[in-house]
Amino acid sequence: MNGEPHLMSVMVPCLMKTVSGGQVRSIALGHPLLDDYLEFVAARARPNTLIAVAYDLKVFFTVIVKQPADITTADVLTFIKAQRAPRRGAGVLRLEDGEAGLSARTIKRRLASVSGLFGYLIARADAGVNANPVPRGLATRGRRGRAGVRGAPLIRAPRTLPRVLEPAEADAFVAALRTQRDRAMVAAMLLGGLRRCEVLGLRLPDLRPGERRVFVADGKGGRQRIVPISARFFSAVAAYYDSERPRTSSTETVFVVLKGPRRGQPLSAAGLDEIIEGARKRAGLTHLTCHQLRHTCFTRLREAGMALEAIQAQAGHASIESTRVYLHLANDWLAGEYLRAAEAIDAQSVRS
């Protein structure tokens, strides 16, 4: 392989990470070209994106043990087949997409990571890579036997609607929360639509109780926004600061650990997930995530008549296409719109 390291000896189970101040600053797989690409990604993407790309590449080159310049489209198709292989015993299918093995969304993400690597190597022009082995789709034939420019997607990811909480479920869940801190965090998601990472990233200067708004300094994709939020959130935060938050905590982060050796330190994502899971069980709910609280917030806002563009701004969506899902989730709003339109049509028919 012209002196290049053999990938089998490089793709070790653990990624090599450099952590500074709790954030991943760099990550490596031990192969020069792959590590150069990861440095390129690190300069342009967020730490979680970097980790995901590195893991996807690790998986790909563990399955396809070749140098990047030797990878072909046939290898990519072999990788897809391997990812579709059952992981939990023969004949086990995923309910959400009717396929065995990993979900279509996971495989599509991994293919995107691999495609990004080869796009980078092509641009470098010194890696011996002249074409991207990840095809955009499978060629199909047009009508009348002509070769069509259309392509069938390599992976079909089902478009599924996220589940939202019914009002009674939301009430039971909130009642099962044990501290003012927990009530404030849930209110941020359920009433303001904040993401989990945005809740955990809130600092005291970000809170604007007089305006009933919070400043999201580090949203998805690094985007900032100001989010209006219910007075119930600020009431819970005030009660949390008055009676629960350790006075000795020196961090500006709003939500901190209340007990144990990490008392006063910023609450972690795992810690918040544990809080949500405990309240879910006490409320007798079968399934609940932080993102489900966010979906519930925007669905209820849409049902209450909030414009789709306003929900997009509240959610921090880069594209309104991401927001359109709440048109389908807001069943009461959709039914009302249909009935109004149907009544107008019926009235026109009667007049004619």
Feature locations, PLM:
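Conserved tyrosine-mediated DNA breakage-rejoining catalytic core shared by Y-recombinases
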Residues: 197, 201-235, 242
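Active-site/catalytic core of tyrosine-dependent DNA strand-transfer enzymes
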Residues: 231-285
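C-terminal secondary-structure termini that scaffold catalytic or DNA-interacting sites
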Residues: 2-21, 341-352
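Short, basic (Lys/Arg/His-rich) helix/loop patches that form interaction surfaces
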Residues: 227, 273-313
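N-terminal core-binding DNA-recognition domain of tyrosine recombinases/integrases
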Residues: 34-48, 55-151
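Long, amphipathic, Lys/Arg-enriched alpha-helical "connector/arm" segment
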Residues: 93-99, 147-180
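Basic, Lys/Arg- and aromatic-enriched nucleic-acid-binding interface segment
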Residues: 163, 167-196, 221-223, 248
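Catalytic-site neighborhood detector that most strongly recognizes the C-terminal catalytic loop/helix
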Residues: 218, 315, 320-340
